[in-house]
């Protein structure tokens, strides 16, 4: 799309055409026949759709050269990881949790939900 990426654009268009052909090659089954026959045809159609979906993902990931697995995030050393959120308040320029500056909670806090849930439980 920009500069010298014309070759990759052509590859992407080619991949999209292939995927379109794959989806067009698997039309929805006809509504004729007995209930069991229609159910079996739909079941087989869904199985083919799943295969086409996985093939399409593989084609696009190959074309775009994306990793198929999840991308790992860089984490700090295990010694620096804590479960106590009180240590994190005021460090690193992070915003304090809602309601700590003014002392009032917002309706989205768990306290607000417990009030709503409490009224329903009394009925």
From Swiss-Prot:
Protein keywords: AIDS, Host cytoplasm, Host nucleus, Host-virus interaction, Methylation, mRNA transport, Phosphoprotein, RNA-binding, Transport
One GO cellular component term: host cell cytoplasm
Region of interest called Homomultimerization, as start-end residue ranges on this chain: 18-26
GO biological process, one term: mRNA transport
Protein modification: Asymmetrically arginine dimethylated at one site by host PRMT6. Methylation impairs the RNA-binding activity and export of viral RNA from the nucleus to the cytoplasm.
Localization per Swiss-Prot or TrEMBL: Host nucleus, Host nucleolus; Host cytoplasm
Residue list for modification Phosphoserine: 5, 8
One Pfam assignment: REV
Motif (Nuclear localization signal and RNA-binding (RRE)): 34-50
Motif (Nuclear export signal and binding to XPO1): 73-84
InterPro entries reported for this sequence: REV_protein (IPR000625)
Biased composition (Polar residues): 97-112
Record flagged with keyword Protein transport: no
GO MF annotation: an example: DNA-binding transcription factor activity
Comp. bias intervals (Basic residues): 36-49
Location of the region described as Disordered in the Swiss-Prot/TrEMBL record: 24-49, 82-123
Main location (coarse class): host cell
Stretches of the chain forming a coiled coil according to its record: none
Domain topic, free-text comment: The RNA-binding motif binds to the RRE, a 240 bp stem-and-loop structure present in incompletely spliced viral pre-mRNAs. This region also contains the NLS which mediates nuclear localization via KPNB1 binding and, when the N-terminal sequence is present, nucleolar targeting. These overlapping functions prevent Rev bound to RRE from undesirable return to the nucleus. When Rev binds the RRE, the NLS becomes masked while the NES remains accessible. The leucine-rich NES mediates binding to human XPO1.
Quaternary structure and interacting proteins, as annotated: Homomultimer; when bound to the RRE. Multimeric assembly is essential for activity and may involve XPO1. Binds to human KPNB1, XPO1, TNPO1, RANBP5 and IPO7. Interacts with the viral Integrase. Interacts with human KHDRBS1. Interacts with human NAP1; this interaction decreases Rev multimerization and stimulates its activity. Interacts with human DEAD-box helicases DDX3 and DDX24; these interactions may serve for viral RNA export to the cytoplasm and packaging, respectively.
Other noteworthy facts: HIV-1 lineages are divided in three main groups, M (for Major), O (for Outlier), and N (for New, or Non-M, Non-O). The vast majority of strains found worldwide belong to the group M. Group O seems to be endemic to and largely confined to Cameroon and neighboring countries in West Central Africa, where these viruses represent a small minority of HIV-1 strains. The group N is represented by a limited number of isolates from Cameroonian persons. The group M is further subdivided in 9 clades or subtypes (A to D, F to H, J and K).
Protein role: Escorts unspliced or incompletely spliced viral pre-mRNAs (late transcripts) out of the nucleus of infected cells. These pre-mRNAs carry a recognition sequence called Rev responsive element (RRE) located in the env gene, that is not present in fully spliced viral mRNAs (early transcripts). This function is essential since most viral proteins are translated from unspliced or partially spliced pre-mRNAs which cannot exit the nucleus by the pathway used by fully processed cellular mRNAs. Rev itself is translated from a fully spliced mRNA that readily exits the nucleus.
Similarity field: Belongs to the HIV-1 REV protein family.
Protein name: Protein Rev
Taxonomic classification: Viruses, Riboviria, Pararnavirae, Artverviricota, Revtraviricetes
């Amino acid at each position: 799309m920009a500069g010298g990426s014309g070759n990759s654009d052509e590859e992407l268009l080619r991949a999209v055409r292939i995927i379109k052909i794959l989806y067009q090659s698997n039309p929805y089954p006809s509504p004729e026949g007995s209930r069991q026959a229609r159910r079996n045809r739909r079941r087989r159609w869904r199985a083919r759709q799943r295969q086409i979906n996985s093939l399409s993902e593989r084609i696009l990931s190959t074309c775009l050269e994306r990793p198929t697995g999840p991308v790992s995030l860089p984490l700090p050393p295990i010694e620096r990881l804590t479960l106590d959120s009180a240590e994190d308040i005021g460090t690193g320029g992070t915003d304090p949790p809602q309601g700590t500056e003014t002392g009032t909670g917002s309706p989205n806090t768990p306290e607000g939900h417990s009030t709503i849930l409490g009224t329903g439980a009394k009925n």
